[in-house]
A protein has these predicted regions:
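Polar/charged alpha-helical tracts
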Residues: 18-22, 272-276, 301, 377, ...
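Terminal connector regions
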Residues: 637-684, 763
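Residue-level signal for threonine
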Residues: 370, 691, 750
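Glycoside hydrolase catalytic-domain context in secreted enzymes
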Residues: 1-642, 657-658, 666
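Low-complexity, Pro/Ser/Thr- and charge-rich linker/hinge segments at domain boundaries
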Residues: 677-697
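In a subset of proteins, long, contiguous C-terminal domains/tails are tracked
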Residues: 556-557, 593, 624-626, 664-678, ...
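Conserved, compact domain cores that house catalytic/ligand-binding motifs in diverse enzymes
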Residues: 696-769
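A general structural signal for short secondary-structure boundary/capping elements
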Residues: 388-393, 521-526, 628, 680-682, ...
Length: 776
């Protein structure tokens, strides 16, 4: 059964408002705080039930009781974690996983699933990176929207989190994310915007941190002006658990529900604030209406007696894990390993896999498969031996290393399972380095000396350094692949599944190479986002730095040729409200079927502002049989060419030449089409502090700009330079230099200085009149 998540939202809101109007102030305040850890309050006299919310992003984590924080939970399918799902670049798959999560929530009588987490992976050191999709906002947003639509198609709400600018665990409840407006709007908000516009989640969860000094849970600009005003969010805002600072200010800002419940503590504060006139009755009623509307929507979608097929969900988890596996290295085409070869399977993770992260997302899995057992099933017990090599924490001994090397030497292929132990990455703390445990590195190097045919399989939630990479032939990134990850790994290693995953984050050579290295995680209560918009590949590609593995990268057991590109036009009027299409043809020129993630990036040749070298603007995944060729179509609009102009608080497009580059990763873009884009600044918010150059292009022309230049007595700059035949080349060059310097002086002048610089010719009243005309 599919339930439309947005069926008659106005009717639901109207019914909720009518119900709230019948409530006392005390009852309204009661709704604004949870009943224990996981339930909302009900109001029996009005027939308003209580609903249940539960973690988490990759599997249901329902506590046996709402009075418990969730240290134990009912069994549920543990799907692959967010990085693995994002590496699939498959929105249809995310919808399937979301729908399965929705079915499990319905069966467990859970009305809202607390996910997905879509914070940007600003640094590989982020302790909670295993819960987040990507370093790129488009990939994060599209994965999230598909997941949301899947969950909510089953009549269960989602909670997109953590809003916003929440990319670290260190001092996570007290640190201020200090960020400029352009970076906020270009990097850290778009994933949430896409999720809201394309998925309309039932709830959004505010973050623990402060944003530029204001707690996210009481940030009016984020929760009301942007989320509800600019994006049209129709749902309810809930705090992160324990994330309330000043409850009254939170209600004023648009934070509807406090979780977990605080008893009468904050309820009494709200009631007192209303009675004393510090909080309006309308603000209280609005928040209570948000909670009530959520409850009514959930009650209408509830399916008593719902159940799910655990084996079908396990099979889906296996398929999802397989699509997210990324083949990073395959020297001499060592992979896939033909069945019949002798394998030495090494490492504790081979038998006791790390398949999910730690913290609030921890799922109690229905079952767990491991790669060793799955490889034995495929290759036969006589062809597979195991050596511990190192324990689950990555510690080793000389005897363990000797045993591993000996068994590797007697095999045809050695497979070392390594990665990050739970103690290295978890909710609650950030990583100190991107290095793997030293014992694991020792193990890889010892096995490499004994067996040249070595494959390393990584189980980790974010990027790791690989100083050993040139000593091994194969590297397989399997992430934290969920309860069925072991089977998926075996299928990829044996060739039963052709790997099609692509990295959703850059793997740097070292932590010192990362853009956040000087800033992360911050100090003295402040996290400085000093790298600006240059996050992930935007930084590496702009700086011409070679990472270990680039964003969007992933190998296959087949080969793909990018055979053609064509745009619907070589000119695009960005202000015309239309769009432009780009057709891309790709052919499978290998011997086996495979899937390719086709990625489109935009590059501006001569930007008026500093911009990243390239930015992802579209992607799709194609399945191709050997010899098969397909053409897909991308559609781009104004926003895809725009940058956020903080001075005008608007998305702006400058006229110029743009390249649309297409290929299989951010560093492999063989196809390109070039177009001229006609544009101008967006709707500007001009003030006395605006610069003269900010008046260019207003109303489609430069009349305002010309008026300002003439007011300074420099109207001759608006005319072509007079270059006569009798002038020498040196005189012409000197004149051009002088004009450029004068233009720069004029353009950079704040208009509030014009009355003085014009010696009074440009009066204050004239300036005010021009500002009024420019704003009209």
């Amino acid at each position: 059964m599919e339930t439309k998540q947005n069926d008659a939202p106005n009717d639901t809101h109207k019914a909720a408002a009518e119900l709230v109007a019948r409530m006392s102030i005390e009852e309204q305040a009661l709704l604004l705080s949870g009943d224990g850890w996981w339930r909302t309050h009900g109001i029996a006299r009005l027939g308003l039930p209580s609903i249940w919310v539960a973690d988490g992003p990759h599997g249901l984590r329902k506590s046996p009781s709402s009075d418990e924080p969730g240290m134990t939970s009912v069994p549920a399918t543990c799907f692959p974690t967010a990085p693995a799902l994002a590496a699939s670049w498959n929105t249809a798959l995310l919808h399937e996983v979301g729908a399965a999560l929705g079915r499990e929530a319905q069966a467990a009588d859970v009305q809202v699933l607390l996910g997905p987490g879509i914070n940007i992976k600003r640094s590989p050191l982020g302790g909670r990176n295993f819960e987040y999709f990507s370093e790129d906002p488009l990939l994060s947003g599209r994965m999230a929207a598909a997941y949301i639509n899947g969950v909510q198609s089953e009549g269960v709400g989602t909670s997109v989190k953590h809003f916003a600018v929440n990319s670290q665990e260190s001092e996570r409840m007290s640190t201020s994310s200090d960020i400029d407006a352009r970076t906020l709007h270009e990097i850290y908000l778009p994933a949430f915007e896409i999720a809201v516009r394309e998925g309309q989640p039932w709830t959004v969860m505010s973050a623990y941190n402060l944003v530029n000094g204001t707690p996210a849970s009481e940030h009016t600009e984020l929760l009301t002006d942007i989320l509800r005003g600019a994006w049209g969010f129709e749902g309810m805002v809930v705090s992160d658990w324990g994330g309330i600072n000043d409850r009254v200010r939170g209600v004023e800002a648009g934070n509807d529900l406090e979780m977990p419940g605080s008893g009468d503590h904050n309820r009494n504060k709200i009631i007192a604030a209303v009675r004393e006139g510090r909080l309006s009755k309308d603000a209280l009623a609005q928040a209570a209406t948000g909670v009530t509307a959520l409850v009514l929507k959930a009650a209408a979608a509830h399916r008593p007696g719902a159940h799910f097929d655990a084996q079908a969900h396990h099979a889906l988890a296996r398929r999802a894990a397989g699509e997210g596996i990324v083949l990073l290295q395959n020297a001499d085409q060592l992979l896939p390993v033909p069945v019949g070869k002798k394998l030495a399977v090494i490492g504790a993770f081979a038998k006791t896999p790390r398949f999910q992260g730690a913290g609030s997302s921890l799922v109690n899995p229905i079952q767990v498969t491991n790669a060793y057992d799955e490889l034995v099933a495929l290759f036969g017990a006589g062809n597979v031996v195991h050596a511990e090599g190192c324990d689950g924490e990555g510690d080793t001994t000389a005897s363990m290393l000797d045993d591993a090397a000996s068994k590797a030497a007697s095999a045809d292929v050695a497979i070392v399972f390594a990665g990050l132990p739970e103690s290295y990455e978890s909710e609650g703390f950030d990583r100190r380095s991107i290095d793997m445990p030293p014992g694991q590195v020792q193990l890889i190097e010892a096995v490499a000396q004994a067996q040249p045919n070595l494959v390393v399989v990584l189980l980790n939630g974010s990027a790791v350094a690989m100083r050993w990479a040139d000593k091994v032939k194969g590297i397989v990134e399997a992430w934290l692949g969920g309860q069925a990850g072991g089977g998926a790994i075996a299928e990829v290693l044996s060739g039963r599944v052709n790997p099609s995953g692509k990295l959703g984050e850059t793997f740097p050579v070292s932590v010192e190479q990362t853009p956040t290295f000087p800033h992360f995680p911050g100090r003295d209560g402040h996290a400085l986002y000093g790298e600006g918009v240059f996050v992930g590949y935007r930084y590496y590609d702009t700086r011409r730095l070679q990472p270990l593995f680039p964003f969007g990268f992933g190998l296959s057991y087949t080969r793909f040729a990018y055979t053609g590109i064509r745009s619907s036009s070589n000119r695009f009027d960005a202000e015309g409200g239309g769009s432009i299409t780009v057709d891309v043809s790709v052919k499978n020129i290998g011997a086996v079927a495979g899937q390719e993630v086709v990625q489109l990036y935009v590059h501006e040749r001569a930007p008026a502002v500093v911009r990243p070298e390239i930015e992802l603007r579209a992607f799709d995944k194609l399945a191709l049989e050997p010899g098969e060729e397909k053409t897909l179509r991308f559609t781009l609009s104004r926003r895809d060419f725009a940058y956020y102009d903080a001075r005008s608080s608007a998305w702006s497009v400058h006229a110029g030449t743009f390249d649309l580059r297409v290929g299989g990763s951010s560093r492999d873009l063989p196809l390109q089409v070039t177009m001229e884009v006609q544009g101008r600044h967006g709707a500007k918010r001009l003030s006395r502090q605006s610069l003269v150059r900010d008046f260019k292009g207003l109303g489609g022309g430069d009349a305002h700009y010309a008026e300002l230049v003439r007011a300074l007595g420099m109207g001759d700059l608006l005319e072509p330079a007079k270059e006569t035949p009798d002038m020498t080349a040196e005189q012409i060059a000197a004149q051009r230099k002088a004009r450029m310097a004068t233009f720069a002086f004029v353009d950079e002048m704040p208009v509030n200085k014009l009355p003085a610089f014009s010696l009074g010719r440009f009066a204050e009243t004239r300036l005010e009149e021009m500002l009024r005309r420019a704003a009209s």
